[in-house]
Amino acid sequence: MLPPALLRRSLLSYAWRGSGLRWKHASSLKVANEPILAFTQGSPERDALQKALNDLKDQTEAIPCVVGDEEVWTSDVRYQLSPFNHGHKVAKFCYADKALLNKAIEAAVLARKEWDLKPVADRAQIFLKAADMLSGPRRAEILAKTMVGQGKTVIQAEIDAAAELIDFFRFNAKFAVELEGEQPISVPPSTNHVVYRGLEGFVAAISPFNFTAIGGNLAGAPALMGNVVLWKPSDTAMLASYAVYRILREAGLPPNVIQFVPADGPTFGDTVTSSEHLCGINFTGSVPTFKHLWKQVAQNLDRFRTFPRLAGECGGKNFHFVHSSADVDSVVSGTLRSAFEYGGQKCSACSRLYVPQSLWPQIKGRLLEEHSRIKVGNPAEDFGTFFSAVIDAKAFARIKKWLEHARSSPSLSILAGGQCNESVGYFVEPCIIESKDPQEPIMKEEIFGPVLTVYVYPDEKYRETLQLVDSTTSYGLTGAVFAQDKTIVQEATRMLRNAAGNFYINDKSTGSVVGQQPFGGARASGERDIPGQPRLVQLWTEPPFTPLAVSPPLGDWRYSYMQ
């Protein structure tokens, strides 16, 4: 990380020189992806994590709303339960009501003026420091809270709450620094200079349970660009989300730039969309919720001081398409990881698999063999666990209902798994289903659980099957094609051009890396906000304006041809 003084000097600098303005472009801020630690037996990182997990045993952390730089404790108290041990209340938190949310909006609007004027170098420095804290002394804490609170295994927590969140903070800082260096052409003797300012008003950040990193990014990216944010974290990710918020504050984030406001969803949505100061919504969640927010914004357009910007990612019904030329080992390993890691609770998880008849006996045998080795359990006590419980009782009931549908449908056959048990935690066995009907609802609708449905197609009808892949569902987030035949890969890439925002070849549909594979979809999967690339920080700036365009003094107001 660059020291503050050096970081400032790396940015666009300018100074008065007589009657003109002199400036130069920014240098690039060097960052790299955070290494993923192994957590092998006896390693320092494993020992530190084990201690952090032990510290959380049977503990309930009290979490306030943070509004106006004050911890506010309301009477509307809620609890976050550990998914794999719902007898453990990991967090006690309170909801903000409409009055408190309006107070937060007022505090945000007041804080914006000073925050937006702060040099981007100073703002970036805060997020770089937070990244260093997450990479070092606070790593074990954020991993343990993500594991216990959201049911992640050590590797899934490491990928999410450490590596990806650190990458978001560092790469966004890089993108912000470099954006300042993008300047218009200056033709002597004139000099043009642009400033990238934050949006006028406040941004509402609404984050999901399944990635600690997403919460930090939804709130952090707009704040980095000079905006003020009301952050509504997920009830089922409260423990880790509050830890991220505290780390940002300890890294130097000023009061009221991000305010931490757990709230009832409809209350939060109604309040922010009725405020004249709303300038943006940064969202990850369900399609119905995002559509509702869009409608609320549309209905209130006449009251806003500016047109709000809406960015949203809404999940997917992601596919793996297998051609007869595919490598079976890659298909099996990639599909098991994509479908069942974190219990299928990733927006990018594979939930529909298309397999040619010629390979189905081999792939089926391998899938069932490897499926029998998957261990589902308590990831805090057994690091051999591949995935844990689903997030809460609501998710458990939804997935169980789909499995009951699979048992009763004549076109569906359960090949493995699918047992459910909520006596201790919300456990669902990874389930593999074969469908005779490619248009069966289970092939169309997002389940968000450890359920993989397979459709076996005649080898010679691969083109028709590619059309099915493209047209079956309303989503368009991620997908993968497995084929060794380059001609088939090219053809599939053309035919599935609009079927996925992140399209993989001979690799699983999950696992995008910040700065390498910017993540986002289209269709019902969202507005394509594209975290992980420069466009994200640009989204949260006003169109640049020219504060100084220095030219020779204008003489006669008339043009020469008029004389």
From Swiss-Prot:
- Please verify whether the record's keywords include Membrane: no
Q: Where is the signal peptide?
A: none
Say yes or no: keyword Mitochondrion present: yes
Share an example GO biological-process annotation for this protein: proline catabolic process to glutamate
List of residues binding substrate: S512
A GO molecular function for this record?
A: 1-pyrroline-5-carboxylate dehydrogenase activity
State the reactions this protein catalyses. L-glutamate 5-semialdehyde + NAD(+) + H2O = L-glutamate + NADH + 2 H(+)
Q: Which InterPro entries match?
A: Ald_DH/histidinol_DH (IPR016161), Ald_DH_C (IPR016163), Ald_DH_CS_CYS (IPR016160), Ald_DH_CS_GLU (IPR029510), Ald_DH_N (IPR016162), Aldehyde_DH_dom (IPR015590), P5CDH/ALDH4A1 (IPR005931)
Per the UniProt entry, the Enzyme Commission number(s) are 1.2.1.88
User: Pathway, per UniProt?
Assistant: Amino-acid degradation; L-proline degradation into L-glutamate; L-glutamate from L-proline: step 2/2
Its quaternary structure?
Homodimer.
Q: Which family does it belong to?
A: Belongs to the aldehyde dehydrogenase family.
What NCBIfam families does this protein's entry cite?
Answer: D1pyr5carbox1 (TIGR01236)
Per its database record, what is this protein's job? Irreversible conversion of delta-1-pyrroline-5-carboxylate (P5C), derived either from proline or ornithine, to glutamate. This is a necessary step in the pathway interconnecting the urea and tricarboxylic acid cycles. The preferred substrate is glutamic gamma-semialdehyde, other substrates include succinic, glutaric and adipic semialdehydes.
Entry protein name: Delta-1-pyrroline-5-carboxylate dehydrogenase, mitochondrial
This chain's source organism reads: Rattus norvegicus (Rat)
